[in-house]
């Protein structure tokens, strides 16, 4: 996180995507900025300052998940969303709670790898182009016993790569000149559609046993991969596609993965955010039926992770002491006090998110960056159609969404997506075949498309 992103600036960035819920935005912004403050303190004091985990309570579709997800993107932090109901108590079949930390590390590794790929891209592209030149204009092979034995040893060790031209080739002046010509054409982009045959590493098959080992922090695929040669398959690709494959290969050779994994672990420990959804579903307020896995048992399993513990992963041990946990739930049939007291104490910041009003729906349709209306306008623009919504139509859509939520299940802003899809289904279907330059959605059109469904309560439940 950078020093420039103060709590106020974080809230301003969240405002671009999320309407209302100012209290929740302020709380997450302060919790996040406290991480930066902690890193400015002496090392000894840093260890004693733990993150102020947060508990969000509010109906579905009001922005709980979106606030956390956008927050992670703003500060470029590893983020995972998990559902509390997916976990089972230790001793039962199912995902153990430590898997959320392993998922977070995987996300951090992916982010670090992406950063490193960008860092070495120019160098990797140059190497990939050199390999393409040698694949398009191969040298004259010179086989001898020594080289054959060397290749056999490389294959047994898993290091042999058919894409990599071998040293035992003879390059004549004619071949050298042709390669220079091909290299020049590649640089000018003249050979992008030409086909070339390369060897591509075959994706390993999913092994259920490997998944079980992964939950224990053991990477079976890595262990077996070091012992067994990598399987490859021949593929004929366009030069443009083959280059991307070779760039990936060359990038991996240029990256120091031991160092990358260490940085990923550090990134997880200092910046990681875990969003635990549906925490209300594992409270005592939701009574357990006979034979059901103990909900309190899951809470007690989550407790040490949130309190701060060390989890074994295939990249190394990860401390959860400074990971920020955000728990959320509707709490329609229970309340936060139904959580076990120890877990309540680990979420000192409580935020209640408000149900969305009709005015909120109007703003959600129009104001956010890449709002729903902007998305549909952009989609139909691809067909050469200019889609226009009148203000009266927008107000009517918001009114319908609010009334349907009140009359049936309240699913918050998600109702808008359902209504818009029904409203625009004919336009989306016929769009590619229409020659109309502009389509205006009026209040009258909204009423025509949706009035029958709204009047019939049974249809409303099934369609909207």
Swiss-Prot record:
InterPro entries assigned to the protein according to its UniProt record, in alphabetical order: AAA+_ATPase, ATP-dep_Clp_protease_ClpX, ATPase_AAA_core, Clp_ATPase_C, HslU, P-loop_NTPase
Any one GO molecular-function label of the UniProt entry: proteasome-activating activity
The protein's matches in SUPFAM superfamilies, at most eight in alphabetical order, are given as: P-loop containing nucleoside triphosphate hydrolases
Q: What is its main location?
A: cytoplasm
The record's listing under Pfam families reads: AAA (PF00004), AAA_2 (PF07724), ClpB_D2-small (PF10431)
Residues involved in ATP binding: 19, 61-66, 277, 342, 414
Q: Gene Ontology cellular component? A: HslUV protease complex
Q: Does the keyword Nucleotide-binding apply?
A: yes
Record bears the keyword S-adenosyl-L-methionine? no
Query: Which of UniProt's keywords are assigned here?
Result: ATP-binding, Chaperone, Cytoplasm, Nucleotide-binding
Cell compartment(s), UniProt: Cytoplasm
Please provide the Gene Ontology terms (biological process) for this protein: protein unfolding; proteolysis involved in protein catabolic process
In which family does this protein belong, per the annotation? Belongs to the ClpX chaperone family. HslU subfamily.
NCBIfam families (alphabetical): hslU, PRK05201.1
Q: What does this protein do?
A: ATPase subunit of a proteasome-like degradation complex; this subunit has chaperone activity. The binding of ATP and its subsequent hydrolysis by HslU are essential for unfolding of protein substrates subsequently hydrolyzed by HslV. HslU recognizes the N-terminal part of its protein substrates and unfolds these before they are guided to HslV for hydrolysis.
Quaternary structure (record):
A double ring-shaped homohexamer of HslV is capped on each side by a ring-shaped HslU homohexamer. The assembly of the HslU/HslV complex is dependent on binding of ATP.
Q: Under which name does UniProt file this protein?
A: ATP-dependent protease ATPase subunit HslU
């Amino acid at each position: 996180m950078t020093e420039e992103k103060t709590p106020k600036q974080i809230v301003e960035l969240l405002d671009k995507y999320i309407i209302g819920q100012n209290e929740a935005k302020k709380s997450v912004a302060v919790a996040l900025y406290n991480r930066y403050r902690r890193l400015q303190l002496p090392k000894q004091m840093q260890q004693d300052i733990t993150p102020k985990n947060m508990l969000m309570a509010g109906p579905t579709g009001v922005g709980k998940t979106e606030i956390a997800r956008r927050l992670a993107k703003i500060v470029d932090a590893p983020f995972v969303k998990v559902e509390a109901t997916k976990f089972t108590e230790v001793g039962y079949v199912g995902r153990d709670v430590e898997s959320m930390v392993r998922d977070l590390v995987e996300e951090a590794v992916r982010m670090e790898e992406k950063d490193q790929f960008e860092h070495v891209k120019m160098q990797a592209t140059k190497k990939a182009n050199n390999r393409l030149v040698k694949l398009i204009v191969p040298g004259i092979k010179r086989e001898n016993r020594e080289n054959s034995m060397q290749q056999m040893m490389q294959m047994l060790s898993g290091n042999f790569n058919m894409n990599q031209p071998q040293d035992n080739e003879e390059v004549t002046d004619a071949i050298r000149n042709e390669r220079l010509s091909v290299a020049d054409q590649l640089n000018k982009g003249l050979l992008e559609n030409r086909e070339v045959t390369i060897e591509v590493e075959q994706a390993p098959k999913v092994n259920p046993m490997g998944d079980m080992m992964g939950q224990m922090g053991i990477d079976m695929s890595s262990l077996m991969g070091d012992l067994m040669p990598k399987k490859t398959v021949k593929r004929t690709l366009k030069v443009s596609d083959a280059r991307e494959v070779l760039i990936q290969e060359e990038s991996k050779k240029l990256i120091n993965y031991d160092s990358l994994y260490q940085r990923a672990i550090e990134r997880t420990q200092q910046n990681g955010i875990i969003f635990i959804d549906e925490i209300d579903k594992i409270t005592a307020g939701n009574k357990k039926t006979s034979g059901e896995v103990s909900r309190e048992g899951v809470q007690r399993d989550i407790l040490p992770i949130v309190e701060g513990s060390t989890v074994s992963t295939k990249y190394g041990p990860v401390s959860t002491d400074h990971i920020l946990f955000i728990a959320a739930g509707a709490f329609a049939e229970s309340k936060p006090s139904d959580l076990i007291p120890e877990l309540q104490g680990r979420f000192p910041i409580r935020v209640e998110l408000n149900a969305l009003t009709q005015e909120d729906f109007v703003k959600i349709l129009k104001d956010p960056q890449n709002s729903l209306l902007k998305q549909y306008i952009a989609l139909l623009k691809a067909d050469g159609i200019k889609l226009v919504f009148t203000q009266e139509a927008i107000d009517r859509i918001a009114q319908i969404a609010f009334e349907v939520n009140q009359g049936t299940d309240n699913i918050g802003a998600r109702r808008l997506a359902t209504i818009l899809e029904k409203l625009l289904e004919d336009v989306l279907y016929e769009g590619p075949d229409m020659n109309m330059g502009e389509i205006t959605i009026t209040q009258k059109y909204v009423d025509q498309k949706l009035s029958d469904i709204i009047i019939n309560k049974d249809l409303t439940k099934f369609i909207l």
